[in-house]
Amino acid sequence: TFLPLILECQNSYNLSLLGTYDWNSTEGNDIWGWVDPADESEYALVGLVNGFSCVNVTNPSNPVEEFFISDLSSTWRDVKTWGNYAYVTTEANAGLLIVDLNDMTGNTYWNIFQFNNPSTGQSTSFTASHNLYIDENGICYIFGASSNNGSNPADGAIFLDVAANPTNPHYLGAWNDEYIHDGMVRGDTLYAGCIYTGNLYVIDVSDKNNPATIGMHPTPNAFTHNAWVSDDGNYVFTTDETSDAYIGAYDISDVTNIQEVDRIQSNPGSNSIPHNTHVDGNFIVTSWYRDGTTVHDVSNPHNMVQVAYYD
């Protein structure tokens, strides 16, 4: 995965480049945004092959790297935030990296491998994981976990409480029916991309000790990479990480009877691969291999319309 920050413009429509930052000797694999509540400075939190970078993009025409944390080499490194902390997963055996963003020297961070629950005595450990999501309640969902130390963590979703203690998250439970590649959560519902079964899963996570699958639907190209729910909660959008695949749109107003309502490609026949799609109001913003970034108007999810792109 390469970052829009470092792409040279080949063609565009309704999107324009504001600035670039080049790490020269490495490549990017994920990006997330964070706004400092103290002064509203804006930062790009970037997963790189060789570590984690925090870039000040308050002036987008002149981005400045604030700090870099070196880590084990990996093609996969994903970032999310809770409060003033960044949480970073990787498929290298580096555990969960927690970075204190109050310290812009980059010297305050932890690599956590073991997660306990003092109240229940339950625990889990992992050394690697593919991705993560943190919901509005401060619950962190670890996806695709694995271990090289003999433990056997859930590779579906592990639930951690980062709100109570951001630097020492407590283990709450897990869902382990299928491997989850990526997902997002709103309220008590997890929308999961189960890439190896090619299905969107909808999971009730209100009881972290007993999560329950409440809906499931195959995606167009049977390699479900990510899922993101609409603001009104009635629709979900998915990507399949394979050549010439579609973005899918689904009516989930009744999760026991999910209906596909539309699908759309970026550039049919080009072997372009959709990676992640995210909802922004009435639009979805999608990153692609080969085709850069696209924006679709999904005010009518039954008829998604591409309205912008940048490559």
Where are the language model's segments positioned?
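Sec-dependent, cleavable N-terminal signal peptides
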Residues: 1-10
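Feature marking well-ordered beta-strand scaffolds used for ligand recognition
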Residues: 9-311
